[in-house]
């Protein structure tokens, strides 16, 4: 074995050892196959392939993690809410696995530290944290199976964050809530969206929310979706007493 190859293998071994230690601290148990976890933090921009020539990135693991989170949380809600009907259980599960919540979980575990990407972090939106969390859960399932994956979800998601009473009052989407109320009360609503630029020439989207022909809220954000949600939240507080039935 050449001297250079020995140095490379030694460096790789040291790198894997550090990665293993950090994973074990987050997981609470030892990972068996680091390849699954390497994949969970590899962005498609790396253009990596596995030994079979298939793309090696976290996108497929996101799918697996999403399925695991959904099934474990569904089972927990089913057992904890014996009187809840299908609609109630579905709504509660949606609140737990909302994109906002998954992003928070990814941030809390600092999974972004493991990301391999040719895209700079500044060019990723908030959802990268939730995407990595889902992929991480998928990697746990492939590495240790359902039982370990279920334990991890209970420890990191359900136990610290799932409070049924608090979740019942949590709003996932102010836009959906406001539209539902407007339709129920036969109110006419309209989102007027327009492009805007700041001094640094960054593109922003402005939104004016009108209800019954009157502008009740305005917002500005880097995406149409964010601007609509912010305007909807402000609109909600204008009509909160009516919407909440107080």
Swiss-Prot record:
Location in or out of the cell: Cytoplasm
A single MF term (Gene Ontology): metal ion binding
CDD domains referenced in this protein's UniProt entry, alphabetically: RIBOc
InterPro entries recorded: dsRBD_dom, RNase_III, RNase_III_dom, RNase_III_sf
EC class (word): hydrolase
Active site: 66, 134
Requisite cofactors: Mg(2+)
Biological process terms in GO annotation: mRNA processing; regulation of gene expression; rRNA processing; tRNA processing
Catalytic activity: Endonucleolytic cleavage to 5'-phosphomonoester
Domain RNase III: start-end pairs: 20-145
Protein name in the entry: Ribonuclease 3
Organism lineage: Bacteria, Pseudomonadati, Bacteroidota, Flavobacteriia, Flavobacteriales
Gene: rnc
